[in-house]
């Protein structure tokens, strides 16, 4: 901007000089000369001017008072002092010519004063010089106008840039180097404008990337000043709402997964029940009469012969399990008459005699030794009663109480939906049998109640005077299935025991 100001001042000065020179080159109108006191030189000049021809008079006036007095007087002419002539008109001409090498000097002008062709050449030179000055003035005027247009354009652009600055930059503290108090080319202001323009460009690019294509096609363009704040606030609100919805959906998904798992388990249980009923319908009535008149026989010790109870057990806080057993082991332990496992606990309920150890009752992996003996290879009635309150237990053999105790898995309820296996001990849910812990012999009348039977009830079952079926699991042909070579055969325990 300093350069533009200097250029404008120089142009104005050049224009004024050219106008002055053009005005000075125009001949002035003739006016009568005024008599100057004591002006002998003026009188001589006037007489010389009157006596000389027109062209010569003009040249004399060109040279001025300090020049030649004119041509000598003719012979016989009266003296100037004796007969003074009346004062004639005086002519003056002021010329402004450039001091160029082509311009004739004063001596050359004096030599060519009396020659008409020399004066004509001088006039032509002066006219060409005046025309050059006029063209120069016109060029300067056009350049000044162009500079003014440029200044207006730059001022307009600067105003638009100021209007596009952020509000914080528009009103932050005193402003320096403005139109009124300083140059516009200060480095600080230029850097500030560049930063503002760069910030605006970045925000515009970011908005173009974030706006969806459908909004760009359908929505009307909003003002640039209103887009960033309103759009960013709406985007922040939408982001918060979406995050809350995502978290809610995640919680619902977890809850649905848990509920679906429970529902799947319930459906599987119902399917098991339905399969049992279908199997009952397919098989028709029981092959044994009465339905509990059968036994399960496991002839040899192995890990693949067993019987499985089809009915699932509920949650139990007390139980009594009674059965008829005849062991055919050779003195190396009676094995496992029955085992009940649930998910996460393979030894929920186990009746086991391993090796030369006494018979044991395991509940939730807690052990109690039972004073029972089955080594005579005969039929024996065994009953085990337990309650979760204080972990009380009782063991009966052939209707008589053999032992009792407490603190066996106290306050632990028997978990439901497990698998009940006859003849094998389970290391996992429903499998991984160990041949050394298998039962060898016959099992009959396995019944299960959800409470502890009284000693009188146990005695009535053992001597066949008051037979009683389990209310949780009765001994029925349709509920017991043999696998791996174990066999089911008709057997009336009271008659068979009498015969044995």
From Swiss-Prot:
Domain Pentraxin (PTX): 292-494
Origin superkingdom: Eukaryota
Annotated residues for binding of Ca(2+) 2: 425, 427, 437
Record PTM text: Ubiquitinated by a cullin-RING-based BCR (BTB-CUL3-RBX1) E3 ubiquitin-protein ligase complex containing KLHL2.
Main location: membrane
Keyword Ribonucleoprotein part of the UniProt annotation: no
Cofactors: Ca(2+)
InterPro entries documented for this protein: ConA-like_dom_sf, Neuronal_Pentraxin_Related, Pentraxin-related
A GO CC term assigned to this protein in UniProt: glutamatergic synapse
Extracellular side: 24-500
Localization terms from the record: Membrane
Coiled coil, from the record: none
PANTHER family: NEURONAL PENTRAXIN RECEPTOR, PENTRAXIN
Record's function text: May be involved in mediating uptake of synaptic material during synapse remodeling or in mediating the synaptic clustering of AMPA glutamate receptors at a subset of excitatory synapses.
Name recorded for this polypeptide: Neuronal pentraxin receptor
Organism whose genome encodes this protein: Homo sapiens (Human)
Gene transcribed to yield this protein: NPTXR
């Amino acid at each position: 901007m300093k350069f533009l100001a200097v250029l404008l001042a120089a142009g104005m000065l050049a224009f004024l000089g050219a106008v002055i020179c053009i005005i000075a080159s125009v001949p002035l109108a003739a006016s009568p000369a005024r008599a100057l006191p004591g002006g002998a030189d003026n009188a001589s000049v006037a007489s010389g001017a009157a006596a000389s021809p027109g062209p010569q008079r003009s040249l004399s006036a060109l040279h001025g008072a300090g020049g030649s007095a004119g041509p000598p007087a003719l012979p016989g002419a009266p003296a100037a002092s004796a007969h003074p002539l009346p004062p004639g008109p005086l002519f003056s001409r002021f010329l402004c010519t450039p001091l160029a090498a082509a311009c004739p000097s004063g001596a050359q002008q004096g030599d060519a004063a009396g020659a008409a062709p020399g004066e004509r050449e001088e006039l032509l030179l002066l006219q060409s010089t005046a025309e050059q000055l006029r063209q120069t003035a016109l060029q300067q005027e056009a350049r000044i106008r162009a500079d003014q247009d440029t200044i207006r354009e730059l001022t307009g652009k600067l105003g638009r840039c100021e209007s596009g600055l952020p509000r914080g930059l528009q009103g932050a503290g005193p402003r320096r180097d403005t139109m009124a108090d300083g140059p516009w080319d200060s480095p600080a202001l230029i850097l500030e404008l560049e930063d503002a323009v760069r910030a605006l460009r970045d925000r515009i690019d970011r908005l173009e990337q974030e706006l969806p294509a459908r909004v760009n096609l359908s929505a009307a363009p909003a003002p640039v000043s209103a887009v960033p704040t309103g759009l960013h606030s709406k985007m922040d609100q939408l982001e918060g709402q979406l995050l809350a919805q995502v978290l809610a959906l995640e919680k619902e998904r977890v809850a649905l997964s848990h509920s679906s798992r429970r529902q799947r388990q319930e459906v599987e249980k119902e399917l098991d029940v339905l399969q049992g009923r279908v199997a009952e319908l397919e098989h028709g009535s029981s092959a044994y009469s009465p339905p509990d008149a059968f036994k399960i026989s496991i002839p040899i010790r192995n890990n693949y012969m067993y019987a499985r109870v089809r009915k699932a057990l509920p949650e139990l806080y007390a139980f009594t399990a009674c059965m008829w057993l005849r062991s055919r082991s050779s003195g190396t332990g009676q094995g496992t008459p029955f085992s009940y496992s649930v998910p996460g606990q393979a030894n929920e309920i186990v009746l086991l005699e391993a090796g030369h150890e006494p018979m044991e009752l395991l509940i939730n992996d807690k052990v109690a030794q039972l004073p029972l003996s089955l080594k005579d290879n005969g039929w024996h009635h065994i009953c085990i009663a337990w309650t979760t309150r204080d972990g009380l237990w009782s063991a009966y053999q052939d209707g008589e109480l053999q032992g009792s105790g407490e603190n066996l898995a106290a306050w632990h309820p028997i978990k439901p939906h497990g698998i009940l296996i006859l003849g094998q001990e389970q290391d996992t849910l429903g499998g991984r049998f160990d041949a050394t812990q298998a039962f060898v012999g016959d099992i009959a009348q396995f019944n299960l109640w959800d409470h502890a039977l009284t000693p009188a009830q146990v005695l009535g079952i053992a001597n066949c005077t008051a037979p009683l079926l389990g209310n949780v699991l009765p001994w029925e042909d349709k509920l017991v299935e043999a696998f791996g070579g174990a066999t089911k055969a008709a057997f009336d325990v009271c008659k068979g025991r009498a015969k044995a």
